């Protein structure tokens, strides 16, 4: 239950501070801070936390300020006198009348307290610690700081804008004694008023944050005038943590945790507006511990250290580093391999609740004691579900767990992607890793854990049910075999992720390919005496050797990985050289230099390459043509509705696994890196899962005699950058063919260029492929072409490759080094730049279309407008992730919304629920 709503008394109406309980001796042993804390708990009043009383002041603050200024103006001030005046001023500031006088100081003929404080602080900084008056001046500064604190609090509570009143509440919490909260009753008998105070402070802070974001001018102007006092807020995170650790009341602890979250946002906003110093500007003396809530600023680097750090960051971009260096695969693999949960959407929701709901200990006990029902053999979700979260869901369902109004309100504010303005999700997606707060990192980790933990076992167990599911589907046998084949390929990849690949496939396959396939192309190149071509092959196969080492080291190198490596790194080169091997070794230069022979070689090589790399698409096209030309068995059109729902649900859950895995991977890569091999494995799973789902939907609609509705294309935030890589690949291929001297080289690189463009285009059109996978393939198949273009362009001017063995060796070494370092880095940058250009041109094209359509409509040319609109509609369908205004919609938003439960389950869809 929430504490009853208690209306605060006015800050100017203050009760006398009296001991809450205990005998006189107990009270006398209390420190002033402890006494203020006890009194604050008894009253819940802001002024009591600062020790303010209603006692009439013994002196007038205006006279004290004037006397202090006169003393400071003397050539030799009496520092004991200054200390006494400052102490008296601090005592006056604690009275109600003193508050009002200091709050209206600018209207009185008195010197400014802030200026006097700055003068004393400056004098103290210049005075050696061994000086006889150092202690007196230090006490004077302490008294002035106390008076200045009370003045700022008085002004912030008495003047508009009212939103600034959150600051006094927060400052009050820094003046409490945390250990008093842990004292046994009767010292502290109730947390009700304290909990309400913190709750109000949280609301006011949230309003202040909103004001600083929307209309900051007035608030910033007021707060900046009290920046010296607001520096005390730097200690607030540590104070809140200490209060939470000592607090014995669960609702109050929850309020303190929530307040800590909004306080973190406030401190960041105050730094952005220059009211508080940025973290990097906060210096810490040697040997001094950083203040609570502060992160120690990184020490300034020397020039050599900065160059070394920049060099390290550059090396991490090199292709060879990515092939050989260990990444963070083990962390993500360990999470996925842990035999814990597959989370259904409801369980996912519950998991996030645990991270933001902050259950009390009593509520946690209720959840822990909730029994889990027996899970049938076929219920994969129940058998693999996370225990605590499943219990939480059941406890809520059976009514044993009752949430407070505040907790229920939090449920309504869970991170959601219903709109792209969702603060939590937007922060996780857009902030760089270094800028994430601790709470944001916790949420990011929670989402990764919820989507990744235990997925491998659960997904494989789910896939093993497919034969039994298909027996109820009514689909023809050939379709069942096709679906089982796709299912088997996914399970094989899941098995590699779970257990690693066999030692044999890792150690033997890639070295065998290098030893068996490299000699022929190298021999042809050297015999043909085309130095530019042979040097490119030296660079090519040297990089293959580096990639070979990376494949041997990585535990995920399975048969599919080796096949992809062989096709991407060897096939085109070996094929082109095999065609020209006989005339080359026979010294038939006449044939080799004929244009017709070169064209025939390029066509044959290109056709074979396209056929091999598009073999699955070609087979699918033949099957489609066969089905249209002959009557095919569509299966049983009449199967029980219960069976149909079970089959549909199985395929939906399978796609749900794939989406969860992708979410976990994308968010994991926000903060860490994974190898290209692991990323390729996860991309393969996502692609096969999409094929699996699409194939079932098409054949199931055909079985039922229904027209399959055209589904929405998945959003792809990397589409334009991948398309930029396609344009870059095409331009590189064309330039390289022009630079090659021999027809053998021209034929090889012409076929290679066509193949590279087709492969990069397939990646661009596949929404399951992210930019890392696209850059990986670019490095493998286009990387050498990229560096060769520049290299041969330079050689065309100086011709160093033909100037003896020394010139050739130097050129080959430079080309090899460039091939091992530059392609991925250059491709990523160039692809992003080209992608931005394509996106810009698309937006301009849409704007031109809209203007043309308006003009055509005005002229009455409705037919032309309709055709134009249809063409643009087709274009928009072909370009994924676009909405009105040219904004790219990040695909993760939709997936996150699916996982947080707003996506209907198959059962809800069947029942017609929203």
Curated annotation (Swiss-Prot):
Using the record for this protein, list the coiled-coil segments as residue ranges, or answer none: none
Question: Region (Disordered) spans which residues?
Answer: 1-31
Keyword presence, Transcription: no
Residue spans of biased composition, Polar residues class: 1-13
Q: Which Pfam families match?
A: HopW1-1
Q: Where primarily located?
A: secreted
The record's keywords, sorted A to Z, are: Secreted
Localization in the cell: Secreted
Q: Which family does it belong to?
A: Belongs to the HopW family.
**The protein's name in its UniProt record:** Effector protein hopAE1
Species of provenance = Pseudomonas syringae pv. syringae (strain B728a)
């Amino acid at each position: 239950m929430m504490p009853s709503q208690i209306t605060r008394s006015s800050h100017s109406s203050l009760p006398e501070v009296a001991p809450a309980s205990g005998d006189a001796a107990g009270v006398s042993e209390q420190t002033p801070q402890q006494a203020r804390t006890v009194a604050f708990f008894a009253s819940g009043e802001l002024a009591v936390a600062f020790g303010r009383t209603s006692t009439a002041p013994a002196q007038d603050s205006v006279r004290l300020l004037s006397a202090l200024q006169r003393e400071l103006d003397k050539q030799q001030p009496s520092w004991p006198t200054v200390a006494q005046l400052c102490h008296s001023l601090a005592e006056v500031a604690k009275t109600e009348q003193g508050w009002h006088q200091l709050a209206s100081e600018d209207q009185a003929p008195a010197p400014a307290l802030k200026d006097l404080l700055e003068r004393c602080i400056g004098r103290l900084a210049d005075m050696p610690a061994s000086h006889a008056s150092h202690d007196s001046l230090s006490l004077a500064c302490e008294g002035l700081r106390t008076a200045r604190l009370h003045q700022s609090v008085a002004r912030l509570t008495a003047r508009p804008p009212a939103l600034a009143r959150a600051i006094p509440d927060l400052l009050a919490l820094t003046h409490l004694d945390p250990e008093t909260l842990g004292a046994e009753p009767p010292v502290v008998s109730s947390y009700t008023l304290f909990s309400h105070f913190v709750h109000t402070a949280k609301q006011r802070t949230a309003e202040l944050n909103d004001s600083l974001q929307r209309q900051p001018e007035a608030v910033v102007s007021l707060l900046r005038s009290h920046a010296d006092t607001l520096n005390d807020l730097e200690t607030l995170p540590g104070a809140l943590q200490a209060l939470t650790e000592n607090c014995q009341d669960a609702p109050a602890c929850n309020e303190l945790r929530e307040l800590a979250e909004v306080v973190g946002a406030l401190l960041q906003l105050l730094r952005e507006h220059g009211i508080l110093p940025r973290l990097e500007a906060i210096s810490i003396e040697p040997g001094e511990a950083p203040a609570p809530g502060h992160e120690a600023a990184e020490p300034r680097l020397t020039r050599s250290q900065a160059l070394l750090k920049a060099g390290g960051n550059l090396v991490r971009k090199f292709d060879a580093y990515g092939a050989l260096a260990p990444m963070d695969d083990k962390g993500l693999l360990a999470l996925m391999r842990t035999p814990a949960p597959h989370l259904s959407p409801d369980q996912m929701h519950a998991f996030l609740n645990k991270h933001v709901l902050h259950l009390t200990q009593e509520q946690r006990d209720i959840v822990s004691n909730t029994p889990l029902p027996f899970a049938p053999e076929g219920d994969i979700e129940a058998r693999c579900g996370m225990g605590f979260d499943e219990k939480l869901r059941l406890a809520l369902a059976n009514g044993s767990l009752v949430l407070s109004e505040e907790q229920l309100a939090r449920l309504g504010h869970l991170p959601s992607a219903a709109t792209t303005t969702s603060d939590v999700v937007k922060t996780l997606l857009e902030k760089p890793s270094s800028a994430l707060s601790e709470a944001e990192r916790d949420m990011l980790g929670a989402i990764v854990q919820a989507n990744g933990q235990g997925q491998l076992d659960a997904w494989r167990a789910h896939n093993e049910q497919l034969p039994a599911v298909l027996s109820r589907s009514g689909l023809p046998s050939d379709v069942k075999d096709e679906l089982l084949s796709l299912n088997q390929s996914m399970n094989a990849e899941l098995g590699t992720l779970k257990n690693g690949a066999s030692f044999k496939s890792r150690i033997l396959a890639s070295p065998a390919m290098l030893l068996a396939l490299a000699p022929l192309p190298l021999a042809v190149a050297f015999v043909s005496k085309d130095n530019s071509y042979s040097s490119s092959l030296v660079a090519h196969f040297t990089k293959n050797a580096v990639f070979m080492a990376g494949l041997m080291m990585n535990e995920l190198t399975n048969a599919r990985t080796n096949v992809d490596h062989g096709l991407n790194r060897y096939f085109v080169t070996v094929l082109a050289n095999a065609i020209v091997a006989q005339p080359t070794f026979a010294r038939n230069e006449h044939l080799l230099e004929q244009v017709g022979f070169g064209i025939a070689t390029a066509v044959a090589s290109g056709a074979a390459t396209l056929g091999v790399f598009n073999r699955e698409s070609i087979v699918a096209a033949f099957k489609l043509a066969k089905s249209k030309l002959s009557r095919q068995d569509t299966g049983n059109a009449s199967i029980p509705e219960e069976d149909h729902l079970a089959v549909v649900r199985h395929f939906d859950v399978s796609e749900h696994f794939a989406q969860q895995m992708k979410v976990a991977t994308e968010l994991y890569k926000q903060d860490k890196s994974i190898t290209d091999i692991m990323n390729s494995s996860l991309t393969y799973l996502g692609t096969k899962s999409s094929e699996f789902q699409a194939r079932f939907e098409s054949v199931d609609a055909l079985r039922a005699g229904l027209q399959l509705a055209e589904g929405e294309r998945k959003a792809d935030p990397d589409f334009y950058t991948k398309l930029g890589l396609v344009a870059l690949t095409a331009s590189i291929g064309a330039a390289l063919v022009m630079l090659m001297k021999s027809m053998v080289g021209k034929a090889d690189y012409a076929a290679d260029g066509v193949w590279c463009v087709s492969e990069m285009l397939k990646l661009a059109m596949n929404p399951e492929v992210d930019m890392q996978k696209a850059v990986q393939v670019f490095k493998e198949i286009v990387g050498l072409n990229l560096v060769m273009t520049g290299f041969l362009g330079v050689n065309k001017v100086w011709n160093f490759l033909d100037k003896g063995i020394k010139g050739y060796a130097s050129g080959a070494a430079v080309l090899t080094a460039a091939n091992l370092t530059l392609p991925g880095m250059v491709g990523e940058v160039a692809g992003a730049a080209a992608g931005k250009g394509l996106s810009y041109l698309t937006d301009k094209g849409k704007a031109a279309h809209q203007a043309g359509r308006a003009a055509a409509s005005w002229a009455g040319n409705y037919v032309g407008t309709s055709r134009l609109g249809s063409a643009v509609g087709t274009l928009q369908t072909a370009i994924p992730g676009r909405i009105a205004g040219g904004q790219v919609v990040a695909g993760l938003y939709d997936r996150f919304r699916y996982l947080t439960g707003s996506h209907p389950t198959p059962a809800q869809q069947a029942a017609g629920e929203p």
